């Protein structure tokens, strides 16, 4: 379908699916104070730097750590957990997240089940700060799920047996390191995700293909600049067993992306071009599908609305993540039975996870029956 037709229907579908400088708080190993009996919501948060198992390289940068803020939301002695993870491209920081959370007065709320009221208030505090908002959204969902005694996939009526396989990400590296990482992952995952976008793309794909024939997804992270060359590359990638391509061109090249999508033999999925629900109508027709990430869209509530809107437009849906603990990854996984693709491996890339949650069994996501977002805090870890 031509993009102009998509744009017209997108506006209707989006409207119909709309659902539902401050110093950060210091880290502490002391348990969170229990406010049982006062009937109010209480928010605690602290910085927590994520240590990556390997240097992570994409088209625009490399890093060994990811800044993160952990959040705890307590009501009547029950605590829900959330987090804000902030890779460089998100444009947010520990300082900005802590400043936002510092001004969020959640103690005014006495009923955590009024989730829309709470999250609407939070969203009204600023036009941005998506990761900070997601942290509270996740913690609130965890809290309410615990109070209800059920995981959110069950509350939403989703079948956990329909959770898809998740990709495992291979960052940009030398052919030798790529082969080593691929051998580590190929026996555990049914599909691998490869970061591309540099002149070394074909060498990386050939290195992977020298050790495994497992299907691949590729993510250019806006790294390709010429649409004709990108199309040639996509035809070559299809011959190598690639099944989808994420964000091939820069976000300001929407018309070129629409041209590419119309001609591509593989699904083209928006990543950096999509953040919130309101973005779907803007990019509809320029991509075959969208990659929803909680840190971009402000959390689980909006992610669910985005799934509904994309489905109404006939678009493919992927659930993605940043490098995160099992807290945010397990929160996103609650929606996984409703999507086509999952890229929920962020917790597997870090060495200092604070939680146990969703696992991978024979390459597929395995959702625990633990109430809330499906996590258990690891003892003696903050």
What spans do the regions from the language model cover?
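Flexible C-terminal active-site loop/helix
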Residues: 11, 34-50, 68, 76, ...
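Conserved, mostly hydrophobic/aromatic
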Residues: 71, 77, 136, 149, ...
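Bacterial Sec signal peptide processing site at the extreme N-terminus
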Residues: 23-33
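Metal-dependent enolase-superfamily TIM-barrel catalytic cores that perform enediolate-based chemistry
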Residues: 152-264
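Metal- or metallocofactor-binding catalytic centers and their adjacent structured scaffolds
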Residues: 34-45, 61, 73-75, 79-148
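N-terminal secretory signal peptides
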Residues: 1-2
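N-terminal export signals
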Residues: 5-24
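Catalytic alpha/beta core domains of metabolic enzymes, predominantly
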Residues: 256, 263, 274-344
């Amino acid at each position: 379908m031509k993009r102009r037709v998509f744009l017209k229907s997108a506006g209707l579908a989006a409207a119909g699916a709309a659902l539902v400088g401050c110093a950060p708080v210091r880290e502490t190993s002391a348990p969170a104070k229990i406010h049982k009996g006062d009937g109010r919501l209480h928010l605690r948060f602290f910085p927590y730097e994520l240590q990556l198992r390997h240097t992570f390289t994409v088209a625009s940068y490399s890093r060994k750590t990811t800044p993160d803020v952990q959040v705890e939301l307590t009501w009547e002695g029950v605590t829900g957990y959330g987090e804000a993870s902030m890779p460089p491209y998100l444009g947010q920081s520990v300082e900005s997240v802590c400043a936002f959370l510092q001004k969020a007065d959640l103690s005014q709320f006495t009923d955590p089940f009024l989730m829309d009221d709470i999250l609407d208030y939070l969203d009204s505090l600023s036009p941005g700060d998506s990761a900070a908002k997601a942290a509270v959204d996740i913690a609130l969902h965890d809290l309410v799920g615990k109070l209800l005694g059920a995981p959110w996939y069950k509350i939403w009526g989703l079948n956990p047996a329909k959770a898809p396989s998740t990709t495992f990400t291979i960052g940009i590296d030398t052919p030798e390191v790529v082969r080593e990482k691929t051998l580590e992952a190929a026996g555990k995952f049914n599909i691998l995700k490869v970061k591309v976008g540099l002149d070394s793309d074909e060498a990386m794909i050939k290195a992977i293909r020298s050790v495994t024939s497992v299907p691949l997804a590729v993510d250019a992270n806006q790294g390709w600049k010429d649409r004709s060359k990108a199309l040639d590359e996509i035809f070559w990638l299809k011959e190598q067993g690639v099944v989808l391509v994420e964000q091939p061109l820069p976000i300001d090249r929407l018309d070129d992306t629409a041209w590419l999508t119309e001609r591509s033999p593989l699904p083209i999925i928006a990543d950096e071009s999509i953040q919130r629900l309101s973005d779907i109508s803007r990019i509809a027709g320029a991509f075959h599908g969208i990659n929803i990430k909680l840190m971009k869209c402000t959390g689980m509530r909006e992610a669910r609305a985005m799934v509904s809107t994309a489905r109404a437009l006939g678009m493919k849906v992927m659930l993605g993540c940043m490098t995160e603990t099992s807290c945010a990854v397990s929160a996103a996984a609650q929606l996984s039975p409703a999507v086509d693709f999952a890229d929920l491996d962020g917790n597997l890339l870090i060495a200092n996870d604070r939680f146990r949650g969703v696992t991978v069994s024979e390459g597929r996501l395995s959702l625990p029956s633990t109430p809330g977002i499906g996590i258990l805090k690891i003892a003696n870890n903050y």
